[in-house]
């Protein structure tokens, strides 16, 4: 026999009292309800409106910083390419000098090969040797396209450092640096903070567009410079091969004396 009375409902134990039910979960961002919105609600709405433009302005500022960093790397790489051109031109000049000296040695060897008239002819008609060249430093001249791109980027870098002295802390404080005269305020919101964000975003995007154009000029200038240096390498390879053949020929003639 069951110990419960006949009128007892065992499922009544599963029914929770309404007063003991947990309160529904609420997001911290949920706005309070009520006929009169408090000041916190207005502040929250204002922050929500500015959240998107603020993040976009910060993102474009970071992109602008990265663009200038890339441009600095491009300029440094271009200058290294110019230095490499100087090395190649100096090497080519030295190979040309070696070729001239070798030709002069071959003339001397040919003049002393004759047993009877060699020495007489050597002293009578000694060829005039060209004066030794001064081994001064060679100033490399890069392609005009690369030179112009380097100068333009360096000039812009000085302007950028003047307007953004703290390059690694581009943040919303730069909003105050946007000149009002450079933009048409009629196309922006009336709210001053929101308008400042929109102006900063447009300013960053314009600067990014111009900067990417300079990066493209650097890339094209480097391409032209590399093509010209490839021509120097081809000439240098041909001259070195020819010099190697002449050295072996001269060495053979000396052994036959």
From Swiss-Prot:
GO terms for molecular function: SNAP receptor activity; syntaxin binding. It is a peripheral membrane protein. It is found in: Cytoplasm; Golgi apparatus membrane; Cytoplasmic vesicle, Autophagosome membrane; Cell projection, Cilium membrane. InterPro entries: T_SNARE_dom. Residues 195-257 form the t-SNARE coiled-coil homology domain. One of its GO terms (cellular component) is Golgi membrane. SMART domains: t_SNARE. Residues 20-32 have a biased composition (Basic and acidic residues). The modification Phosphoserine is found at residues 77-78, 114, 163, 181, 203, 209. Keywords: Autophagy, Cell membrane, Cell projection, Cilium, Cilium biogenesis/degradation, Coiled coil, Cytoplasm, Cytoplasmic vesicle, Golgi apparatus, Membrane, Phosphoprotein, Protein transport, Transport. Its main location: cytoplasm. GO terms for biological process: autophagosome maturation; autophagosome membrane docking; cilium assembly; exocytosis; protein transport; regulation of synaptic vesicle cycle; regulation of synaptic vesicle exocytosis; synaptic vesicle fusion to presynaptic active zone membrane. Widely expressed. CDD domains: SNARE_SNAP29C, SNARE_SNAP29N. Residues 1-42 are annotated as: Disordered. Forms a SNARE complex, composed of VAMP8, SNAP29 and STX17, involved in fusion of autophagosome with lysosome. Interacts with multiple syntaxins including STX6. Interacts with EIPR1. Interacts with STX17; this interaction is increased in the absence of TMEM39A. Belongs to the SNAP-25 family. This is Synaptosomal-associated protein 29. It comes from Rattus norvegicus. The gene is Snap29.
């Amino acid at each position: 026999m069951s110990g419960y009375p006949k009128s007892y409902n065992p499922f009544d134990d599963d029914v929770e009292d309404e007063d003991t039910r947990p309160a529904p979960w609420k997001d911290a961002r949920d706005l309070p309800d009520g006929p009169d919105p408090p000041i916190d609600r207005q502040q929250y709405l204002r922050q929500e409106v500015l959240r998107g433009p603020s993040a976009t302005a910060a993102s474009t500022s970071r992109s602008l910083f990265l663009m200038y960093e890339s441009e600095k790397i491009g300029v440094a790489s271009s200058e290294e390419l110019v230095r490499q051109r100087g090395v190649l031109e100096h090497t080519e000049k030295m190979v040309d000098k070696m070729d001239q000296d070798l030709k002069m040695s071959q003339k001397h060897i040919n003049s002393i090969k004759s047993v009877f008239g060699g020495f007489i002819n050597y002293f009578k008609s000694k060829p005039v040797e060209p004066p030794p060249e001064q081994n001064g430093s060679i100033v490399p001249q890069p392609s005009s396209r690369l030179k112009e791109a380097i100068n333009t980027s360096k000039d812009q870098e000085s302007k950028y450092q003047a307007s953004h002295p703290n390059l690694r802390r581009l943040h919303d404080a730069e909003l105050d640096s946007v000149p009002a005269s450079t933009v048409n305020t009629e196309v922006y919101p009336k709210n001053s903070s929101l308008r400042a964000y929109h102006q900063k975003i447009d300013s960053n995007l314009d600067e990014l567009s111009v900067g990417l154009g300079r990066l493209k000029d650097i890339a094209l200038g480097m391409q032209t410079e590399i093509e010209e240096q490839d021509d120097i390498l081809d000439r240098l390879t041909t001259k070195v091969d020819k010099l190697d053949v002449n050295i072996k020929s001269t060495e053979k003639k000396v052994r036959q004396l």
